[in-house]
C-alpha cells in the first residue's frame, strides 16, 4: 500500500466510491457528472491536503485521507475509503502514516476528527489509533434534508490526539 498526494488522474476511481456515499458527511461530495469528477479531482490535486491511498502502488485508488490546517499547530483530519476494501486494515495503516506525516513533517501538536454517531467503523478506527473521545455535539451539523426539506442534524463525536500521546504509543 502506498500514500501519495492526490493526482488528477485518480478521479475515475475516486468518483466510483463517491457516486454513492455511505456516510452523510460525504453526501455533499456526491459526484453525478464526469465534469464534476474532473473539477473536484483537480481541486484535490492542487495542494497536499488530500492524500491518495493506493493498493500495492499499482495506481489502484482505494481511498483518501485529508487534513485541514488550523493555526498555529492543529489539524482536522478525515478519511474516506471504497467500501470494497473495508475491514482489511488499510484505513488504519494509512491513517498511521498520515499521523506520522503531520506530527513529524508538519509539526502538528494536535489532531482531531469529527465522526458521526452512527459511523461505527470510523469511531473504532479513531480508538485504535489512540485518539480520545472528547465529547459529543448533539445535532451539530446537517448534511442532508428529510423528505420535507427539513435539515436532518447529526450527532457528532470529536476525537483528538496530542503529539506527546502519539509519541508514547510509538515506544
Model-based region annotation:
Residues 1-21, 54-171:
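Acyl-donor (CoA/ACP) binding surface of acyl/acetyltransferases
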Residues 14-15, 26-29, 44-48, 75-79:
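Short charge-dense sequence patches
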Residues 33-36, 45-47, 82-84:
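Juxtamembrane/interface motifs at transmembrane-helix termini
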Residues 41-53, 63:
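A short helix-loop-beta-strand connector motif used in the catalytic cores of GNAT acetyltransferases and
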Amino acid at each position: 500500500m502506498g500514500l501519495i498526494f492526490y493526482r488528477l488522474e485518480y478521479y475515475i476511481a475516486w468518483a466510483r466510491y463517491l457516486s454513492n456515499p455511505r456516510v452523510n458527511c460525504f453526501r455533499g461530495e456526491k459526484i453525478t457528472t464526469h465534469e464534476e469528477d474532473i473539477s473536484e479531482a483537480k481541486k484535490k490535486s492542487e495542494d497536499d491536503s488530500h492524500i491518495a491511498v493506493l493498493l500495492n502502488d499499482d495506481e489502484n485508488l482505494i481511498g483518501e485521507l485529508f487534513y485541514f490546517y488550523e493555526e498555529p499547530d492543529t489539524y482536522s483530519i478525515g478519511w474516506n475509503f471504497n467500501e470494497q476494501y473495508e475491514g482489511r486494515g488499510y484505513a488504519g495503516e494509512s491513517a498511521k502514516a498520515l499521523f506520522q506525516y503531520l506530527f513529524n513533517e508538519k509539526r502538528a501538536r494536535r489532531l482531531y476528527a469529527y465522526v458521526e454517531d452512527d459511523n461505527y467503523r470510523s469511531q473504532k478506527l479513531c480508538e485504535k489509533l489512540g485518539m480520545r473521545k472528547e465529547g459529543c455535539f448533539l445535532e451539530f451539523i446537517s448534511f442532508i434534508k428529510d423528505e420535507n426539506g427539513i435539515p436532518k442534524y447529526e450527532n457528532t463525536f470529536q476525537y483528538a490526539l496530542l503529539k506527546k500521546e502519539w509519541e508514547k504509543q510509538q515506544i
